[in-house]
From Swiss-Prot:
This is Arginine biosynthesis bifunctional protein ArgJ. It is found in: Cytoplasm. It comes from Streptococcus thermophilus (strain ATCC BAA-250 / LMG 18311). Catalyzes two activities which are involved in the cyclic version of arginine biosynthesis: the synthesis of N-acetylglutamate from glutamate and acetyl-CoA as the acetyl donor, and of ornithine by transacetylation between N(2)-acetylornithine and glutamate. Heterotetramer of two alpha and two beta chains. InterPro entries: Arg_biosynth_ArgJ, ArgJ-like_dom_sf, ArgJ_beta_C. Its main location: cytoplasm. The record marks A183, T184 as: Cleavage. GO terms for biological process: L-arginine biosynthetic process; ornithine biosynthetic process. GO terms for cellular component: cytoplasm. Its EC number is 2.3.1.35, 2.3.1.1. The lineage of its organism: Bacteria, Bacillati, Bacillota, Bacilli, Lactobacillales. It catalyses: N(2)-acetyl-L-ornithine + L-glutamate = N-acetyl-L-glutamate + L-ornithine; L-glutamate + acetyl-CoA = N-acetyl-L-glutamate + CoA + H(+). Belongs to the ArgJ family. The active site is at T184 (nucleophile).
Length: 397
């Protein structure tokens, strides 16, 4: 597998565009991804009991059609908690886009992100849609889906399947309300592989638990967010089938793209200065390892310690202890940046200057060794700063 300098439109047969329609005052806020032919599609959606109208529309269409031609997205207005009118507006958003592309409405996915409780300004949407073009600027799409993010989040890779080259690309947004299960973000992945929707869903479902569901910024789960994958077969490879070496290769490709997007989201948490990675190793099973890792990275006390560049092993061990996992914790090793701070559940002395250098970096890795098995799990998050409170205190409702 090779990482390339690409966009969401790098896979064959895809294009994208983004622009400023007026959902936000100045920044880009409207865009689409278009496949030149019907693409296999798979999705995972928020687990919040309050589900935004666009998710209802998209989830229904994915289940009904099993194929997709385009995804249209606005940012600035979430169209969540907007009742019957909000649902009607989401369907209208889908229908207008379908009319413009000359396809059936169920072939269109819709997504919205932004302020909850506001109806979509439909004149703004209609005006923006009239200006979107096929084969537009894919980098502008990556900008158009952002809310409080400080940077775009994209990744693109290629892999060979026999004599054919398959390209996969991803783009995401997410900065606050990040505690997916699956939730709190928008992620879109395009691919030109020949793979059915059912097989694509299998690959997505298998990998979401190890990637997007292992990030946390603030523990809040959004009403709006989802991950959609489209694969249109333009690479002309032999169909990828389950339980084959080709499926395993495709799954690893998808896992890499999803993991890179997840890390970019965690690193861009609201007010964040540092990316935190927690590796739990030698656990009795992978699920326990992932639960412990997410417990540590989600701890507000651990987050604030990392912000203050304090190697507070006590907070880390406490988060391990309340993770809800029945694993002995009387023989735990904890390393920060590879430097031991606890061995066999007892603190050890360490070089203060070496630790200071580790804690001062913009990425901090915490390793928890349980000595209870051979499985591992990883989670990602960010530190918790003064700016997080400031950003969310000033955010408009």
């Amino acid at each position: 597998m090779k990482v390339i300098d690409g966009t969401i439109a790098s896979p064959l047969g895809f294009s994208a565009d983004g622009l400023h329609a007026g959902f936000k005052k100045r920044k880009m806020d409207f865009g689409w991804i278009v496949s030149e032919k019907p693409a296999s599609v798979a999705g995972v959606y928020t687990t919040n009991k309050v589900i935004a109208a666009p998710l209802i529309v998209t989830k229904t269409s994915v289940k009904k059609a099993g194929k997709m031609r385009a995804i249209v997205v606005n940012s600035g207005v979430a169209n969540s908690c907007t009742g019957t009118q909000g649902l009607e507006d989401a369907y209208t958003m889908q229908e207008w886009t379908a009319e413009k592309l000359g396809v059936e409405p169920d072939m269109i996915g819709v997504a919205s992100t932004g302020i909850i409780g506001e109806l979509l300004p439909m004149d703004t949407l209609k005006n923006g849609l009239s200006k979107l073009v096929v084969n537009g600027n894919a980098n502008d799409f990556a900008k158009a889906i952002l809310t409080t993010d400080t940077a775009t989040k994209t990744i693109a890779v290629t892999e060979t399947f026999g004599r054919d080259v398959v390209t996969m690309a991803g783009v995401a947004k997410g900065s606050g309300m990040i505690h997916p299960n699956m939730a709190t973000m928008l992620g879109f992945i395009t691919c030109d592989a020949n793979i059915s929707s059912d097989t694509l869903q299998l690959a997505l479902s298998q990998n979401v638990e190890k990637t997007f569901n292992q990030i946390t910024v603030d523990g809040d789960t959004s009403t709006n967010d989802m991950v959609l994958v489209m694969s249109n077969g333009c690479a002309l490879n032999d169909e990828i089938l389950p339980d084959t070496p080709e499926f395993d290769k495709f799954s690893k490709m998808l896992n890499f793209v999803m993991q890179e997007l997840a890390k970019k989201i965690a690193k861009d948490g609201e007010g964040a200065n540092k990316l935190i990675q927690v590796d739990v190793v030698n656990a009795p099973n992978a699920l326990d390892a992932r639960m412990m890792a997410k417990s540590v990275v989600g701890s507000s006390l651990v987050k604030t310690a990392i912000f203050g560049e304090d190697p507070n092993w006590g907070r880390i061990l406490a988060a391990v202890g309340y993770a809800g996992v029945d694993v002995p914790v009387d023989n735990v090793d904890i390393m920060i940046g590879g430097l031991p701070v606890m061995l066999a559940s007892s603190p050890v002395t360490f070089d203060d200057e070496e630790m200071k250098d580790i804690m001062h970096g913009d990425e901090v890795t915490i390793t928890v060794d349980l000595h209870s098995g051979q499985e591992k799990g990883t989670a990602w998050g960010c530190d918790l700063s003064y700016d997080y409170v400031k950003i969310n205190a000033l955010y408009h409702t």
